């Protein structure tokens, strides 16, 4: 049973959302009284309540989404609120839809999107993974964090070839290492206010760390927002090489450590926006003619299911005319389709840039 103190907090949070007329989050949009009453007295086997899901969105009324899953079970137990939010964000992924099985496809059909090197500064492909048998951040114990770090760092030690590198735990990190990782844009900081409010930063920095290969083209974040964020990147537009590296790494880790996957939702993540393939394939690209009008740039990108962000990612501005453009869709398509969608859209946008007056 959910205790009275939690129920009181839930009622207060619900009222705060209802009263916030300028709040535009998906949480506010779909958490009506009926849905709230259906969910407020439920608790997952690990003890997570609706409050754990919504407290960040209640505290931060400027959230875009406003909800997180404290553990895997939350997605099914609190389906009355998660399902409509997932359907809205992932553009029509209905409660009856099923995410397709994992398929990285034929890598040979992936190309260098900018062989001339004129437009694309760098290319990144990342995915998120959760370790099977462990909840997400708010429900993890200090011992869980250490145990997970031990398991993944042992696997890092077996990496060979271009994946070979070094693991840097955040605990006890010296200033010189820290500065080097900041200069490389590899270091992640303790979570922002959205993650803090979701209780995603407990026992910091225990169990958190960064692995990168010697060439600095492959990176794993351990226990940041998700258990694992696996990132492959390099200068230029050679999407094929970058995607191949990511696939090799994911397969290597998965052969030794099972990931948390749901038949309907695909790979499970802390935030519902990353479910499914969890893949975000992006380029840092300068398209000076198309970018003269940012609204127009966004409209063109949207035609190809692509999303435009500032140079440093979400909530940032463009620096030197360089934008971060990525695939928007993560659910209801395969990993291969997600990457191919980004590739095809960028190829078209470069053609349009070249044809522009």
Curated annotation (Swiss-Prot):
Reactions accelerated catalytically: L-arginine + ATP = N(omega)-phospho-L-arginine + ADP + H(+)
GO biological process, any: phosphorylation
Superkingdom in the source lineage: Eukaryota
Positions contributing to L-arginine binding: 64-66, 225, 271
Keyword Transport part of the UniProt annotation: no
Transmembrane segments: none
Matches recorded under Pfam families: ATP-gua_Ptrans, ATP-gua_PtransN
InterPro entries the UniProt entry points to: ATP-guanido_PTrfase (IPR000749), ATP-guanido_PTrfase_AS (IPR022415), ATP-guanido_PTrfase_cat (IPR022414), ATP-guanido_PTrfase_N (IPR022413), ATP-guanido_PTrfase_N_sf (IPR036802), Gln_synth/guanido_kin_cat_dom (IPR014746)
Phosphagen kinase C-terminal domain residues: 119-356
Role of this protein: Catalyzes the reversible transfer of high energy ATP gamma-phosphate group to L-arginine.
Record-given protein name: Arginine kinase
Organism: Polybetes pythagoricus
